[in-house]
């Protein structure tokens, strides 16, 4: 049986209210841990084209199913509620290529 390909959560974020955003940062890690997420990159990035976001984040999950479950989880819904109004964000999930 083959393992499903990894999945990647890609977030582009500009924080507009740093104090309120701390509420998100305090509880979001619990959701990511629960679903086995691994942070591959985060912080400022050099924008070559497109919108210039303050922060970029790339998180790896063992599968698309795990990434979706994390996003839909009660833990992450609570974190998203803390994030609302504290930042502008685009979040996408993308499936990895698997063995190439």
Where are these regions (language model features)?
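Short S/T/G/P-rich N-terminal loop/turn motif that feeds into the first structured element of a domain
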Residues: 1-56, 61-72, 95-100
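C-terminal structural segments of small proteins and small subunits
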Residues: 68, 76-92
């Amino acid at each position: 049986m083959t393992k499903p390909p990894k999945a990647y959560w890609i977030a582009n974020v500009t924080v507009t209210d740093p104090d309120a955003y701390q509420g998100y940062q305090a509880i979001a890690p619990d959701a990511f841990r629960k679903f086995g997420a691994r942070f591959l990159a985060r912080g400022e990035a050099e924008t070559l084209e497109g919108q210039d976001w303050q922060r970029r984040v790339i998180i790896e999950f063992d599968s698309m199913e795990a990434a979706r479950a994390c996003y839909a989880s009660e833990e992450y819904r609570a974190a998203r509620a803390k994030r609302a109004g504290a930042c502008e964000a685009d979040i996408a999930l993308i499936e990895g290529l698997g063995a190439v």
